Amino acid sequence: MSFFGKMFGGKKEVAPTTGEAIQKLRETENMLIKKQEFLEAKIEDELNIARKNASKNKRVALQALKKKKRLEKQLQQIDGTLSTIEMQREALESANTNTAVLTTMKNAADALKRAHQNMDVDKVHDMMDDIAEQQDVAREISDAISNPVAFGADLDDEDLERELDELEQENFDKEIIGIPEPTPTLPEAPTEDLPEKAKEKKKATTTTAVEDDDDPDMKQLLSWSN
């Protein structure tokens, strides 16, 4: 804006945003760093000229030293300016970060407020009490359903135990009755051959008994022995 514009109330310039200000400071900072490098190189050149002419041309050497002093003064000023710009940029970056954080927190708070605008703490407590009450009712109903009070309440445990003992005794008696009586063990037939005389005597005795009795079973037994 021109000087007359400022004096007579011309249009005001729009203030830059924080991001734009930070960008401008970074550009200025880079420019000053390049200026520093240039001055440092010039100072080194003037120092070399002074060294070369220290003995053979003192006038040139003195002029080089004077120029070096002026350059060093400029470099010192740039160092101070650069430090100020760096601090200002860091302060703006910190403020920008804080602004972003606060904006995010405010948005979150607004969203939370909108989420709770239709909620009332007393209503929430009442609702939780209702839920707890209904849970108690559901638990009581489950206990009532699972408890077989309505079935078999008139039964006597002693009568049931006595009836069970009678059934066990009955089963035991049936098992005892069903056991077969032991069969008498017959002597085993001799495996050795009988003497001839004993065989003849046995045969004659058996034949005589069969003829006298005329029993068909004895005849069959006799035929087996022969």
Curated annotation (Swiss-Prot):
It is found in: Endosome; Endosome, Multivesicular body; Midbody. The keyword Transit peptide does not apply. It comes from the Eukaryota. The keyword Coiled coil applies. InterPro entries: Snf7_fam. Disruption phenotype: Lethal late in embryogenesis. Dendritic arborization neurons have dramatically reduced dendritic field sizes but increased dendritic branching. Increased ectopic axonal branching. Conditional RNAi-mediated knockdown in germline stem-cells (GSCs) of the germarium delays or prevents abscission during GSC division resulting in multi-cell cysts that share a cytoplasm and undergo synchronous cell division. Conditional RNAi-mediated knockdown in germline stem cells (GSCs) of the germarium produces egg chambers with 32 germline cells instead of 16. May be regulated by aurB/Aurora kinase B-dependent phosphorylation. Residues 169-226 are annotated as: Disordered. Changing E86K: Unable to rescue null mutant phenotype, probably due to disruption of electrostatic interactions required for homopolymerization. Its main location: other. One of its GO terms (cellular component) is cytoplasmic side of plasma membrane. Expressed at considerably higher levels in testis than in ovary. Expressed in midgut, eye, mouthparts and male accessory gland. Residues 22-88 form a coiled coil. Pfam families: Snf7. GO terms for biological process: autophagy; dendrite morphogenesis; endosome transport via multivesicular body sorting pathway; female germ-line stem cell asymmetric division; late endosome to vacuole transport via multivesicular body sorting pathway; mitotic cytokinesis; neuron remodeling; symbiont entry into host cell. Homopolymer; forms elongated striated filaments of uniform ~10nm width. Monomers interact in a staggered arrangement mediated by complementary charged electrostatic surfaces. Interacts with l(2)gd1 (via DM14 domains 1 and 3); the interaction is direct and blocks access to the surface involved in homopolymerization. This interaction may be required for the ESCRT-III complex role in multivesicular body formation. Some multidendritic neurons possess extensive and intricate dendrite outgrowth known as dendritic arborization that resemble trees when imaged by microscopy. Mutant larvae possess less extensive and smaller arborization patterns giving the name Shrub. This is Charged multivesicular body protein 4. It comes from Drosophila melanogaster.
